[in-house]
Amino acid sequence: MFERVFKLSEHKTTVKTEVMAGITTFMTMAYILAVNPSVLGSTGMDTTAVLLATALASCLGTLCMAFMANLPFALSAGMGLNAFMAYTVVAGYGYSWQVALLAVFIEGLIFIVLSLTNIREAIFNAIPLTLKKGVSVGIGLFIAFIGLQNSGLCVDSATLVGIISFPENFHTAGICALLTLIGLFFTAVFYTRKMKGAILYGILLTWILGMLCQVTGLYVPTPDAGFYSLFPSWGMTDFSKLGLTFGQCFNVDFSAVGIVNFIVVIFSFLFVDIFDTLGTLIGVATKAKMLDKDGKLPGIKPALLADSIATSAGAILGTSTTTTFVESASGVAVGGRTGLTALVTGILFLVSTLFAPIFTAIPSFATAPALIMVGFLMVGTVTEINFDLDNLTESIPAYLAIIAMPLFYSISEGISLGVISYVLLNLATGKGKKVAPLMYVLAVLFVLKYIFL
């Protein structure tokens, strides 16, 4: 059956290899079940509901990828996209999380149309390979920066950013930041020793060390300051809590939003999501070395369609945009080549719903090393960018995309600057003919965005 559905022999793989790859992928991205509730919880959403929604959306999206695209890619709530929803749309724009989810649902429907009409595929193929690699590196730095912030290591200071003063509030913020550094060290050791699931083991070890610190008095829970007990509440998952987010994207009071403002939110999500999703897919395919010599991904159309369906379904369940995860590359590294890898990962996400109380108790300082490590894995692509002086029309746009993402706290801004600079530099140096026509269209749209939005 597996041979008929996934064409294993054609892809030179076996059921055993695919199963191991699927398990590996899940182990390397299971941290999202702890991180996403932490990020979206800042909007007022119930963390258990977010975890269940994230797990179910991950399962659905990954199964779509398995059967529609036959690719070894797993999907879950995208890092960067969840931050955009929590810290920009809700905290920045002042909208409710219900409005944000409805915007995600609608832009998911729009994405389905764009995927069916080949527009997203055309955009993906129009972006030059060097810029794609720059996007992958930039996303890595962005994710690492979020990890440094969540850990408390990176703080707001007179120099815009700085490192925490460990002696101040040592028994709360100080010890959490220190535990993040320790967790990062062990995660790096696990990776160096080529342990499967190194990121997940790093999270668990950091959490255990935190609980030991609480027992010995090094960590003192201070709920009023946002520092809670690190011990989980044991028991069965309360699946009824999913009702707190399920379908809430349709429970919106438009009188408090305004149709014009709502359209702006949808466009913001659409704009960020299309380029964040493409950026992440670029990062996954680049890291997994699945792009062809022209920088194109074979079979991208059904993959984009699966991604789009998962986004709308995830919004109904109660989570931010669902997208392809760069950790899918870990399963590919083990030998995963078909949708069977994704099938195994999807099933494991479904099983994970039984352990929601444990995942929701994992503190942000324990998941921070995972974010920093994922950032490191993506930044490695920078070695594939040619920075020679005779290649500046390619490398400078990639460089601008890299530095813009973490410094402007936006993946889409990095892509915007990368595309605009690529077009302008090639035009100014007489190389305009090599630029894909769609790149000119994108550059104009980005410029108009800066003028009118």
Please report, for each region that a protein language model flagged, where it lies by residue:
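Loop-to-helix transition at the N-terminal end of transmembrane alpha-helices
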Residues: 43-63
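Membrane-embedded alpha-helical modules
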Residues: 93-208, 212, 343-453
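Helix-loop-helix junctions within the multi-pass membrane cores of secondary transporters/permeases
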Residues: 2-36, 57, 78-87, 91-139, ...
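Helix-loop-helix hairpins and the membrane-proximal interhelical loops
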Residues: 1-49, 164-168, 203-301, 446-448
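Residue-level signature of catalytic and energy-coupling elements of molecular machines
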Residues: 19, 39, 123, 197, ...
